[in-house]
């Protein structure tokens, strides 16, 4: 796919699609609750559609009509054995969280995904689930998909310290703990996105959170709710960066989720001197309007507890750093290696091929700016965030063309991405 290049300004206002993390969880909680759940403004990206289809395969009635998802919950013990293996597509969130959901189901399932998902390690979730009494295994010692799982009605509670900062593993164990008899304690390495905790309470569940320690008493019952999904800050991040690095630009992003566990990119933009305004804050929906404009940027250091709050935004932050004066260091981000691709290497290769100066490290990157970008051919390797990062980078290219291979990967999380880009180019 040939990308738009040499765009000298971006103007306009858009509503980014619904938050992917919350969309996944709304389907899961709605399915496990008793009664009806209605979900508004859900993301209809391929990953979320995979989760929706999996729960249909598990016997849940889910209707998508007039822009509203209606789920007839079956309760914690109401899932049915599927007739076929469960297809998770490209979604690491789906396979990991649903492994926890099925921990208490007394039937056997196989879960598989596409080529990219089949390379992602699942041992981080299979190991603690085995401690709870679940029979679960994959391929090689890292438990790569496909996974075979047989849950148990006699699920044991767990006391577990996460060796990595992972909201997916934490959430999988929380879903399992809801079905175990007794108290489970999950201790995070660093605080990660807390959508599962927030939504558990919204659906009538109980837990206690004390810093990095989460305590869940099981078993519990959940009750169907109305869920309004805010815009995804991970999708908004591409427009935030586009507005900052393109000359003569001014962008307004409406209804963006600003959950405090996800707003690391706002902290980074401010540390780099970016002009960013947060207004119209809705404390209930945890959403706001974000306004950015072209800015002179300086390098910064990104690491530690900040990393889990912006792990998915690091590819586009790397592009931002190429347009900042000085050096930006990203560290403590080894988790990038086991995303849809090895994002440390793939981001560096993609942007370096366009003229950036990025040195990959064991746990991040060293980025020297400011770099003039030129045309190149870039492969997403099936990674949606690499595709969108490259499309934003291409806007700066004055010399040559930018070809993007496997651009369809963007549909994973942002099917309307190129439509929104066109609206901002012509705004």
From Swiss-Prot:
Question: What is the stated purpose of this protein?
Answer: Catalyzes the transfer of the enolpyruvyl moiety of phosphoenolpyruvate (PEP) to the 5-hydroxyl of shikimate-3-phosphate (S3P) to produce enolpyruvyl shikimate-3-phosphate and inorganic phosphate.
Q: By its UniProt entry, which NCBIfam families does this protein fall under?
A: aroA (TIGR01356)
**Residues the entry annotates as binding 3-phosphoshikimate:** 20-21, 25, 166, 168, 312, 339
Where along the chain is the active site annotated?
A: 312
Which region is the signal sequence? none
UniProt GO MF annotations: 3-phosphoshikimate 1-carboxyvinyltransferase activity
Q: Which cysteines are joined by disulfide bonds?
A: none
Q: Under which pathway is this protein filed?
A: Metabolic intermediate biosynthesis; chorismate biosynthesis; chorismate from D-erythrose 4-phosphate and phosphoenolpyruvate: step 6/7
Sites binding phosphoenolpyruvate sit at: 20, 92, 120, 168, 343, 385
- Protein's organism: Streptococcus pneumoniae serotype 2 (strain D39 / NCTC 7466)
Superkingdom of this protein's organism: Bacteria
This entry carries the following GO cellular component terms, namely: cytoplasm
**Under what name is this protein listed?**
3-phosphoshikimate 1-carboxyvinyltransferase
The cellular location(s) given in this protein's UniProt record come to: Cytoplasm
Per the similarity annotation, which family is this? Answer: Belongs to the EPSP synthase family.
